From Swiss-Prot:
tRNA processing found in the keyword field: no
Protein name according to UniProt: Sodium/myo-inositol cotransporter 2
Catalytic activity of the protein: myo-inositol(out) + 2 Na(+)(out) = myo-inositol(in) + 2 Na(+)(in); 1D-chiro-inositol(out) + 2 Na(+)(out) = 1D-chiro-inositol(in) + 2 Na(+)(in); D-glucose(out) + 2 Na(+)(out) = D-glucose(in) + 2 Na(+)(in); D-xylose(out) + 2 Na(+)(out) = D-xylose(in) + 2 Na(+)(in)
Gene from which this protein is expressed: Slc5a11
Sequence intervals crossing the membrane: 28-48, 66-88, 103-123, 149-169, 181-201, 209-229, 273-293, 309-329, 376-396, 419-439, 447-467, 480-500, 522-542, 653-673
Length: 673
């Protein structure tokens, strides 16, 4: 075992490439192909069994998901390929402090189910911009948020996941980057378009199992290679590149590498920023981001939504052990590549002069694992990439259809909404492919830190508007919009400054302005949150009070108010889509305004599949869930009051589990603090 602790020398070749002519064996290819067959089979199965010909069936999986696929989908949507690459890379570079994001997310996902979700369910909303529209009135806040969400999805989430996945695909398979990405995006878009949210959730559940199995196997190989946790602690601080300058501090491991809480002024992640500045973006992601909330809204009732959040919370403990520690092991085993400190050497190793820590996880996969298991881990990375992309595609399509297209065409038929939602997925695929060169040109030394810094500039104002809307009844539209715009403008200024004044390399002087150099992005998150809060409170206090309709069942304190009863609609009134606890259709008075039109009354809406259609057309219509060939009379809509009540025994079990989960997180915080 002693020999396993000795760092291997760089490969003897003309280049210091991190992946010297590694290729997939036939067994690896077989495992990868088997994975794709499983994914397509699950996607097809969920496509066939799910009602996809209604807006609710397509975008909210019919509202009848049980807790375990919801929890698996929450975890898989969060842990994409960017997590595997980014967390392991940051672990190799600076130690375990980056795991604070995962432990912080554990609390936030529980907040979603126990605090925010009851408000969303009581208000019967399907998208987050819609909640703001109903809570504050008007359209400018919801439209601003819809555009901002699409911007974040396209230019940060999709680009980051594609770059991270490309590191694996391009280097391990030696495929052309564009060919590999186009193939993945095509398969991903196919079952997203065909099956809607149900297909996404079921494939996420499958991919969560694959990810966990593969990650546990690699963790075992990693710890075995360094002699366990004690061996890692002893050897990490000795993991230095052989070609680094003795007179430079560049490339040295941090002395506080095994601590989460670090110096408030000089560290990479100051502890006040972790406790406060990190929590606000975390609340935005887990409690107001469409990708996450949409999965919880698909649960059949509040208890199943809580169970899903609990499952995801328990799984959030794992990234520290499955990703961060293996990243640190990779530095120990391959210091000349993973811990390279000279820009020219790093350029030769990974084509990135800023550093090569992001190759830590792929390096372990390709160097430690035997044939077959290497293919399994390749499937894990593909699973992580595809699960994230499917989540983003479906949620972005929902926002565009529900909040933007429905605003442009308020009387659009349900069939039109379904077609627009599917076409938008393909538009996202096209934009994603065109964005690949930008991703390649803007890669950073630590991918995960890049993601979090961008989040800290754009997400706090949105989070504060949601928090104030949910917990202060006096918050009105003018206050929320003023705080949102001011916060976003300040965040965009800091974001632009970060791009203009890029962080210098370790061997270069830091001449950036003080606001960029001396104000950590987590501290800026705190400043941004406080500024938005003061603006919202001040403007709301000196302007009109919100009407009762904008408060009833839309805040924490009014969530149990009875649903306002309206006069019965005439028989010819079109039915409207609603979200309920049990998947039933709600009355128009409490629904979001997505009107359906009887398809038999107009050719514009179509008659389903008529005998005149060819087999090709019928196949396409079946794929898109529009294959009905006869009109089904709409069922009579009865007023239904959405209940937040739970079975007392189930509620007690969930609450006890929540306390246990929080206790585990607090223990880990204290142990590694």
């Amino acid at each position: 075992m002693e020999s396993a602790t000795i760092s291997p020398q760089p490969p003897q070749s003309d280049s210091l490439e991190a992946f010297p002519q590694k290729s997939m064996e036939p067994a690896d290819i077989a495992v990868l192909v088997l994975y794709f067959l499983f994914v397509l089979a699950v996607g097809l199965w969920s496509t066939v069994r799910t009602k996809r010909d209604t807006v609710k069936g397509y975008f909210l999986a019919g509202g009848d998901m049980v807790w375990w696929p919801v929890g698996a989908s929450l975890f898989a949507s969060n842990v994409g390929s960017g997590h595997f690459i980014g967390l392991a890379g940051s672990g190799a570079a600076v130690g375990i402090s980056v795991a604070a994001y995962e432990l912080n997310g554990l609390f936030s996902v529980l907040m979603l189910a126990w605090v925010f979700l009851p408000i969303y369910i009581a208000g019967q909303v399907t998208t987050m911009p819609e909640y703001l529209r109903r809570r504050f009135g008007g359209n400018r806040i919801s439209i601003t948020l819809a555009v901002l969400y699409l911007f974040i999805y396209i230019f940060t989430k999709i680009s980051v996941d594609m770059y991270a996945g490309a590191i694996f695909i391009q280097q391990s398979l030696h495929l052309d980057l564009y060919l590999a990405i186009v193939g993945l995006l095509a398969i991903t878009a196919l079952y997203t378009v065909a099956g809607g949210l149900a297909a996404v959730i079921y494939t996420d559940a499958l991919q969560t199992v694959i990810m966990l199995i593969g990650a546990f196997i690699l963790m075992g190989y990693s710890f075995a290679a360094v002699g366990g946790m004690e061996g890692l602690k002893d050897q990490y601080f000795l993991a230095l590149a052989s070609n680094r300058s003795e007179n430079s501090s560049c490339g040295l491991p941090r002395e506080d590498a095994f601590h989460i809480f670090r110096d408030p002024l000089t560290s990479d992640l100051p502890w006040p920023g972790i406790l406060f500045g990190m929590s606000i973006p975390s609340l935005w992601y887990w409690c107001t981001d469409q990708v996450i909330v949409q999965r919880s809204l698909a649960a059949k009732n509040l208890s199943h939504a809580k169970g899903g959040s609990l499952m995801a919370a328990y799984l959030k403990v794992l990234p520290l052990f499955l990703m961060v520690f293996p990243g640190m092991v990779s530095r120990v085993l391959f210091p000349d590549q993973v811990a390279c400190a000279h820009p020219d050497i790093c350029q030769r190793v990974c084509s990135n002069p800023s550093g090569c820590s992001d190759i830590a996880y792929p390096k372990l996969v390709l160097e430690l694992l035997p044939t077959g298991l290497r293919g399994l881990m390749m499937a894990v990375m593909v699973a992580a990439l595809m699960s994230s992309l499917t989540s983003i595609f479906n949620s972005a399509s929902t926002i565009f259809t529900m909040d933007l297209w429905n605003h442009i065409r308020p009387r659009a038929s349900e069939r039109e909404l379904m077609i627009v939602g599917r076409i938008f997925v393909f538009a996202l695929v096209l934009v994603s492919i065109l964005w690949i060169p930008i991703v390649q040109a803007s890669q950073g030394g630590q991918l995960f830190i890049y993601i979090q810094s961008i989040s800290s500039y754009l997400q706090p104002p949105v989070a504060m508007v949601f928090i104030m809307g949910c917990f202060w009844k006096r918050t009105n539209e003018k206050g929320a919009f003023s705080g949102l715009i001011l916060g976003l403008l300040l965040g965009l200024v800091r974001l632009i400054l970060d791009f203009v004044y890029a962080q210098p390399r370790c061997d270069q002087p830091d001449d950036r302005p003080a606001v960029v150099k001396d104000v950590h992005y987590l501290y800026f998150s705190m400043i941004l949150s406080f500024t938005t809060l003061i603006t919202v409170v001040t403007v709301s206090w000196f302007t009109e009070t919100p009407s009762k309709e904008m408060v009833s069942r839309l805040t924490w304190f009014t969530r149990h108010e009875p649903v306002a009863q309206k006069d019965s609609a005439p028989p010819e009134t079109p039915l409207s889509l609603t979200l309920s606890q049990n998947g039933t259709t709600e009355a128009p008075g409490t629904s979001i305004q997505l009107e359906t039109v009887q398809e038999s009354t107009t050719k514009a809406c179509g008659d389903g599949v008529s005998p005149r259609h060819s087999k090709v057309v019928r196949a396409i219509l079946w794929l898109c869930g529009m294959e009905k060939n006869k009109e089904e009379p709409p069922s009579k809509a009865e007023p239904v009051i959405v209940s937040l009540e739970e079975n007392p025994l189930v509620k007690t079990l969930l609450d006890v589990n929540c306390i246990v989960c929080i206790s585990c997180a607090i223990f880990l915080w204290g142990y590694f603090a």
